């Protein structure tokens, strides 16, 4: 094992990377509330794992979506547990994100020189809410259908661009297969990719600037 480690160490300088990660200064005022961002990240990773598992059985069509969710819950081994963990971690992610935003705001973590860190955090908050909206529709039950119809109908009130925007969201003039396809694509590909990119930016800036000091 030591020879294998030495081989990688010679090429990648693993020890130097580990020392840099573990030697980062942590201010003495840091408490448990500073862990809320990390908990949000953990919930996101759980979402990715459980969501990926469900894609093997879920069918994004208006005729089969609800039946496929029922199949996951009743027929698939541990499907009920995977979907339940997905739902619970989704709620936990939203809650932890809200508490994290409040903590950062109340402790002044958005002030100079951390404005861009705050901006990426706000973008991540919007993406988190978007996960909730798109994921809520995927079972395509009565609640999901009418939730999508209401949410996608909100932009109708915007002058000039309202109607085209509604059609863009729905994929057609009314809620249907095109809407479900778009929401599924957003929920399983577009939003996770954007979230991963902005999380990386967020963490790199935190790593560079460090944790904000006390008020």
Swiss-Prot record:
Keyword set includes Nucleotide-binding: no
Domain of life (superkingdom): Eukaryota
Keywords of the record, alphabetical order, are: Chloroplast, Electron transport, Heme, Iron, Membrane, Metal-binding, Photosynthesis, Plastid, Thylakoid, Transmembrane, Transmembrane helix, Transport
Q: Where, in this chain's numbering, is heme b 1 bound?
A: 100, 202
Record GO terms (molecular function) = electron transporter, transferring electrons within cytochrome b6/f complex of photosystem II activity; metal ion binding; oxidoreductase activity
Swiss-Prot/TrEMBL cofactor(s): heme b; heme c
What is the UniProt remark on how the cofactor binds and its stoichiometry? Binds 2 heme b groups non-covalently with two histidine residues as axial ligands.
Instruction: Give the signal peptide, or none.
Output: none
Complexes and interactors? The 4 large subunits of the cytochrome b6-f complex are cytochrome b6, subunit IV (17 kDa polypeptide, PetD), cytochrome f and the Rieske protein, while the 4 small subunits are PetG, PetL, PetM and PetN. The complex functions as a dimer.
Its job: Component of the cytochrome b6-f complex, which mediates electron transfer between photosystem II (PSII) and photosystem I (PSI), cyclic electron flow around PSI, and state transitions.
Q: What is this protein called?
A: Cytochrome b6
Species annotation: Morus indica
């Amino acid at each position: 094992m030591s020879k294998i480690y030495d081989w990688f160490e010679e090429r990648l300088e693993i020890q130097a990377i580990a020392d840099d990660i573990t030697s980062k200064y942590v201010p003495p005022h840091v408490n448990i509330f500073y862990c809320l961002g990390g908990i949000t990240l953990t919930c996101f990773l759980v979402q990715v794992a459980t969501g990926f598992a469900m894609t093997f059985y879920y069918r994004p069509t208006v005729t089969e979506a609800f039946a496929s969710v029922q199949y996951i819950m009743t027929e698939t081994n541990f499907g009920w547990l995977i979907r339940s963990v997905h739902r619970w971690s989704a709620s936990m992610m939203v809650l932890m994100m809200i508490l994290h935003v409040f903590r950062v705001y109340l402790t002044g973590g958005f002030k100079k020189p951390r404005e861009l860190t705050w901006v990426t955090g706000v973008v991540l908050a919007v993406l988190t809410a978007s996960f909730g909206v798109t994921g809520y529709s995927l079972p395509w039950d009565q609640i999901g259908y009418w939730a999508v119809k209401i949410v996608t109908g909100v932009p109708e009130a915007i002058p000039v661009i309202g109607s085209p925007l509604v059609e863009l969201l729905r994929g057609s003039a009314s809620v249907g297969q095109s809407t479900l396809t778009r929401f599924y694509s957003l929920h399983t590909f577009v939003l996770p990719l954007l979230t991963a990119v902005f999380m990386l930016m967020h963490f790199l800036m935190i790593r560079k600037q460090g944790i904000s000091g006390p008020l």
